[in-house]
Regions:
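Inhibitory N-terminal propeptides of secreted protease zymogens
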Residues: 21-136
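Subtilisin-like serine protease catalytic core
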Residues: 22-23, 33, 37-39, 92, ...
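C-terminal subdomain of the subtilisin-like protease fold in secreted/lumenal serine endopeptidases
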Residues: 147, 266-270, 373, 404-459
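Short acidic, glycine-rich surface-loop motifs adjacent to enzyme active sites
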Residues: 237, 257-281, 299
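C-terminal outer-membrane/trafficking sorting elements
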Residues: 458-535
């Protein structure tokens, strides 16, 4: 029966979509092989020639997508996994993955070259080393007040004036762990086996033996509205340990764990790590997480001030990359700059957040405070650190505020709102550019520009909802069509609430600069239609 079942599954999978790539060694691994003695083993990742494509599944079909990824990987890796034991002690630490179709292992040079000749192998790359080292800082006591960075992005205005703190939203991280008992978190770790993963030391309860992970999570959702170091103090969180002090990395395992959580997966994963270069290793992994409905944000890196220093995955066009600013809103000297490396035509540019990224390769997408940021440490103290590692969780926190207001936001919508509501300055322009992106994060403007959840349903209950006009394509466009209703009155407001024009007919918004605007439609003495956001 098992044989029949495998044949049937294989027959089905052969009809399912997949991505195919030709076999090659990455340049970094080729250089390393040239310097490796015959008996030494290298940490490598063998990518299969075919990759499952879950983008064709209907949105929200998480269980079917994950099962397809697992089945596709299991069947396509079967023959290779059966072959590896023949190499004896030349191969060890074999670990198959399904979040991408590949196998991590330690192997000698001759084994690597032999595997490359297989028709089912598409690429072999070196498993990278990422060191997350705590930056020098001074321990400081808790201060009863706002930190400069929280006030700078106006997160406190979101709590006070708009009433959003991230409540009901779950933030995850891929970092050095988190001390969930730190007083700043106030019991907001979600708890349970689906809220912590440690592929490094396999501990069952969260911990952080470094400090970096606790610090970054504190920025995203630490503290409270009365005494806050965090942007979204009402959010809960889950955590993983992907790094240790020796540079061992288990990012792939953490991403796969998140993908397997299903309805328990976090809304957002904050990533304060990256690798210099133009590798596409995380491309399919992060795309799969995105398709599964998990929002992600990545630190741009700390290799500035030269251009072209942005690390990956922040450099990928389907995710948000964040640079770092100082207390005076200038770009930090160490903040990595664009442009991104050229990755080739890996997939349709329709999946890119920035519509013109293919030509501009612009990164970062935006910046956030990264210098002298005070947050929680791995014990019960606080520490001031500087890095784009500190910048990225600011954006993750703002995303939590936005998602509390509207949990149905898509990645393109989030990107559009964040970039169109940034603060820009007389220096560093014109914007957007390869240093600041679209500008510095503004939490208040971003949440204000976020359309409330269920706006269509509320509009349907309004007397004016019978006006049959639509925004095409919804929700972001430079125009919208109002067929057959030239007599309606439309008022447009900018992000500050200032009315910028009143229109009749079919030239609504004509002459306005690109940006986010609010539209109110009225007819006669009827009540205005609920605010609709367009670009």
């Amino acid at each position: 029966m098992r044989c029949v079942k495998q044949v049937l599954i294989l027959a089905v999978l052969l009809l399912m979509p997949c991505l195919v790539q030709a076999g090659y060694l990455t340049p970094d691994l080729q250089a390393k092989l040239d310097q490796t003695s015959p008996n030494d083993k290298l940490k490598v990742i063998v990518r299969m020639a075919e990759e499952a494509d879950i983008s064709v599944f209907p949105q929200g079909q998480w269980e079917a997508m994950v099962q397809y990824l697992k089945d596709f990987a299991a069947i396509s890796q079967t023959d290779l996994l059966a072959t590896l034991p023949r190499y004896g002690n030349k191969v060890s630490q074999i670990k198959p993955f399904w979040i991408y179709n590949g196998i991590a292992m330690e192997a000698t040079k001759d084994v690597v070259l032999n595997l490359l000749r297989r028709p089912d192998v598409g690429c072999i790359e070196e498993k990278g080393i990422i060191k997350i080292e705590p930056l020098p800082g001074k321990k400081e006591p808790r201060v009863n007040g706002l930190e400069w960075n929280i006030a700078r992005i106006q997160a406190d205005r979101v709590w006070r004036e708009l009433g959003y703190t991230g409540r009901g939203i779950v933030v995850g991280n891929i970092d050095t762990g988190v001390n969930v008992n730190h007083p700043t978190f106030g019991g907001r770790w979600r708890g349970g086996s689906n809220s912590w993963f440690d592929p490094i030391n396999h501990q069952s309860y969260p911990y952080d033996d470094n400090g970096h992970g606790t610090h970054t999570m504190g920025i995203a959702c630490g503290g409270s509205t009365a005494d806050s170091i965090g942007v979204a103090p009402g959010a809960t969180f889950v955590a993983t340990k992907a790094f240790d002090a020796s540079g061992n990395v288990e990012v792939d395992a953490c991403m796969q764990w998140y993908a397997g959580l299903g309805s328990a997966a976090p809304n957002i994963i904050s990533n304060s790590w990256g690798v210099i270069g133009n590798s596409t290793h995380y491309w399919q992994i992060t795309r799969n997480l995105q398709i599964l409905g998990i929002h992600q944000v990545y630190a741009n890196g700390n290799s500035g001030p030269d251009s072209g220093t942005v690390g990956y995955p922040a450099s990928y066009p389907h995710h948000i990359g964040v640079g770092g600013t100082t207390t005076s809103d200038t770009l930090a000297s160490w903040s990595s700059r664009g442009p991104s490396p050229y990755f080739g035509a890996i997939e349709s540019s329709a999946n890119y957040l920035d519509p013109v990224w293919a030509s501009s390769r612009r990164k970062p997408d935006l910046t956030a405070p990264g210098l002298n940021v005070r947050s929680a440490w791995y014990d019960t103290t606080y520490r001031v650190l500087s890095s784009t590692s500190m910048s990225a969780p600011h954006v993750a926190g703002v995303m939590a505020l936005m998602l509390e207001k509207n949990p149905n936001l898509t990645d393109p919508q989030i990107w559009q709102i964040l970039t169109s509501t940034c603060d820009t300055f007389s220096w560093g322009g014109p914007y957007p550019n390869q240093n600041y992106g679209w500008g510095r994060l503004n939490a208040y403007r971003a949440v204000l520009a976020t359309p409330p959840s269920g706006v269509d349903e509320e509009a349907a209950r309004s007397p004016v909802s019978r006006l049959p006009f639509s925004v095409r394509p919804n929700p972001f466009t430079s125009f919208f069509a109002v067929p057959g209703h030239e007599t309606e009155c439309f008022s447009l407001y900018d992000i500050s609430g200032r009315r910028v024009g009143t229109y009749r007919g079919d030239r609504i918004g004509e002459g306005l600069q690109a940006g986010v605007y609010f539209v109110r439609a009225a007819k006669g003495d009827q009540k205005p239609l609920r605010v609709v956001k367009v670009r």
